[in-house]
Amino acid sequence: MSLRRPSPDGIAPHEYNFKKKRKVAEICQALNTDPIDVAALRRMAISEGGLLTDEIRCKVWPKLLNVKMDDLPPAPGQELREDNEDYQQVLLDVRRSLRRFPPGMPDEQREGLQEELIDIILQVLQRNPQLHYYQGYHDIVVTFLLVVGERLATALVEKLSTHHLRDFMDPTMDNTKHILNYLMLIIDQVNPDLHDFMQSAEVGTIFALSWLITWFGHVLADFRHVVRLYDFFLACHPLMPIYFAAVIVLYREQEVLDCECDMASVHHLLSQIPQDLPYETLISRAGDLFVQFPPSELARKAAQQRAERTAASTFKDFELASAQQRPDTVLRQRIRDRLRVEERTKSILTKPRTNRFVKLAVMGLTVALGAAALAVVKSALEWAPKFELQIFP
């Protein structure tokens, strides 16, 4: 099943403006409702065009994350950077983030924002010692900083870090790798041929790591596309980024299948995200896949796959194979085989037209079976473990 379809025709400017004005009015209505209609805001964030402007995002993103505007963190003090174990790594990452700032921004303004970016990250980590910094985290934080400013960004990022991004901020990458495994599960459900090709290429899922842990902020050049995806992700389940990653791979099905079936070729192709993707179409399809294959089903399939790979679950198959190799089992089977062969031999030899060559062939077959039986018995004695079978019923 392919997800690639022609992109829809462009909307006429006057029609687009009408839809935009109507959507802005609906967002304002949801914001002015008492209580605020968060469900409607989520629908607006997901639907075509997302939240439209940064001005609207400043009002809606806090509602989507349940952040209260009158309870923002205080401004950080100078002591924040002193004796902070993450400071040097954060500093290096932020210094390398030049391309995440708008082109043409004056150096002085950009450098000031970079200092604010460092403070946001360190403050969130200081207030939440259970969180661990990872490279790529700053790509998410800078998006919030550029849209909503330092103080509100600190509150939003803190809430995001303790919820949506929590698995990425563990001491190990175990949970991150577990989420990445969902990528292949989704692809397998939609397009088994593509899944099998990628498995044969042994490409794995590492190509999608930066997509996932930066919410695509690190790999998309156009900031408009980044904030559009953030609208979508903030309004959805925390696993939605992995569904979006899956639809990108599925959309590029033909490119992947045209590749050499080896890890290097497929990894190189998928690591380079085209900048002209039909984002609205892919967002819609990611939502469809989420409904069709919800996280609960993916978790069940992932658990089933893990169980099939564990020693305990494969024990019965191994036990059966070993039992069939045990000397007593082998001998009983070979005796039955020999008796059957002898019966067939007797039948053939009693036929008046049976010639000498047939008799010799049958005798040779009987001898060969006997030799095979001895070889199997010997191998069983050498390696078959002596299981306490009653331990694993």
PLM features per residue range, with description:
Residues 104-110, 121-128, 190-202, 207-215, ...:
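Active-site-adjacent structural elements in folded domains
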Residues 42, 46-47, 57, 61, ...:
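Amphipathic alpha-helical interaction motifs in eukaryotic regulatory proteins
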Residues 38, 117, 136-137, 190, ...:
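N-terminal alpha-helical segment
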Residues 55-59, 112-116, 135-136, 152-155, ...:
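Residues within HEAT/ARM-like alpha-solenoid scaffolds
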Residues 1-128, 318-393:
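N-terminal transition regions in large eukaryotic proteins
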Residues 207-261, 364-371:
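Long, repeat-rich segments with strong aromatic
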Residues 2, 15-22, 33, 40, ...:
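Extended, Lys/Glu/Leu-rich amphipathic alpha-helical scaffolds
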